[in-house]
């Protein structure tokens, strides 16, 4: 497709995507709003309040903003593909004793994958979202770079580390140079009804943030209980099913001990949850798989980066190097708490996203 000034904005009904659409229209783009309804709860548990990005209220808000801005708006039902690509993955990971982050895959396959397809159907070269990140093209590397948003408190680059060069080529991020406060102020100034709308904090398809109940409803059976063992293999008691536990967890174990106990590992093959003390939760090395690189095509040698092992974690210095078959060995210079299989580890060079992968296991 030839470059043109038509852009499809993924509109969630929130303030960020609404201001994104406004800014692009002000810049002279031909803006089309598209809201993707990715989740319709068959059990009727899904929230329909203003916090849920999948609710009817969210669709109504997006349409209202589009009317105010004078742009066309479409709603696309992607619930089936979302279930196949994201929800099944989420459930399978928990049943394997891992703690997934479905949002990173939703961004890759739905918000930037399916949205880009829809954009091309509508004759648009570009897609845009309300993420707080920046993009630039590096002439020397001949690659598009993903950079942190200037508002480091709202930076969402961790969630977008799986984007491809093709997706970045077509992506626009107007909010990358704004703070959240500036975005809300602008929305209020231009009279958008979502200026003070609360942000959605939970996973969009998990009612009341109760993922355990969600999984049980989806698999239509109870999870199998198993054994608690300590790091030396000693039997300590019985657990209620591995989906109820994550690395670093202390509450809800139901075990008595003279010192606090924490989940330090999960053995899904034997249905065993391994517990230890606070010092056993920390680690310095991990292996990541299913890696995706942005600033480089492939990791071919050892490099020094900063990295973080979950969205809310602080970055810390680390060395990454190729390991076996397309895996990466990550060695932190300082111990990290609760290295959790299934979560993403993301690598940075300053404010540039190098890449990242899914944590496979803690090495030590």
Curated annotation (Swiss-Prot):
Site feature: Interaction with tRNA: 131, 343
A GO BP entry: tRNA wobble position uridine thiolation
Main location: cytoplasm
Gene3D superfamilies reported for this sequence: Adenine nucleotide alpha hydrolases-like domains, HUPs, Translation factors
Annotated segments matching region Interaction with tRNA: 154-156, 310-311
Root EC class: transferase
Database matches in SUPFAM superfamilies: Adenine nucleotide alpha hydrolases-like
Listed HAMAP family: tRNA_thiouridyl_MnmA
Family from the record: Belongs to the MnmA/TRMU family.
Name of this protein: tRNA-specific 2-thiouridylase MnmA 1
Species of origin: Caldanaerobacter subterraneus subsp. tengcongensis (strain DSM 15242 / JCM 11007 / NBRC 100824 / MB4) (Thermoanaerobacter tengcongensis)
